[in-house]
Amino acid sequence: MPFSGELVHGAWLHWLRCAAPDVATWLHDGNRRRFFTCSSLQFPVSQQRALEAERENVHLPLDPQQVYVVRITLLLGELFPLFYAALMRFNASGTESGNAPCMQIGRQLFRLEEVVLNNDDPSGWTGFTSLSSLVEKTKRLRLSSVQPLTLEFASLTTFNRNNMRSKSYGPHYARLPLPQYVFPGLLRRWEDIAPPELAHVVQRELIEQYIQDDGVIVTDYDLRTHRLKFTTHQQQGFIGTCKYHLRDSDEGMHSALSLRQQLLLLAQLAFYCGVGYKTSMGMGRTRPLEML
């Protein structure tokens, strides 16, 4: 199928379960938020063709001579050595048996060519950092009175609005990246993964009030609706870019960062955790386009 996010999600957990079953169980079980994201299988075709195939649910042929990419992010530092150890064990078992490490996505078997995690890959979608490094980097930012921020939503993004206070009309999927949808979700993810010494850096009440007071506004966008097919249902959403202005209000009370710096910190976090619904199944792949 042209969109394989849920299949990649399952394949990744199955691969990890074979190499490190305790880690896979910890990641999958319970009601905790996912501490990883997975992309759909990315084909070596133009973005336009890939999006058209998703929208029309047109299957793209696989060529054994081509290289296909899966992007996986790990949101806890403790997961990296576990992933590395699992990869080495899998590599050793593959060498002994004469088979290269592989992952089965649906009915297709893929051989692992390489793992890329450096910060300067031409794709612009790889990298590594720590939360403390992100905080220190953000501290050094010098902001204008109206600070621009552009986010690219590269895969289908939507927001599951089933937690609204009013249940009169039932849940729905929001298809616009309004500030009140984007930043509170990133704030919650920060609270999920930040250690105690960094949890206070992002101030929930101040950010929520700042957004409510229209401190963050949408000033430009290049968005379009999009749809894709999961195995059991069709999902609606959007893709594209959205430019925000963060207007001057830098009262970051009792925090290492000003209020607007906190929002820029969350924007950088979006590169790793994604935005919105089903980020562990290929949706919500996001990055800031400014050099933050």
Predicted feature residues:
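RNA-interacting cores
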Residues: 1-292
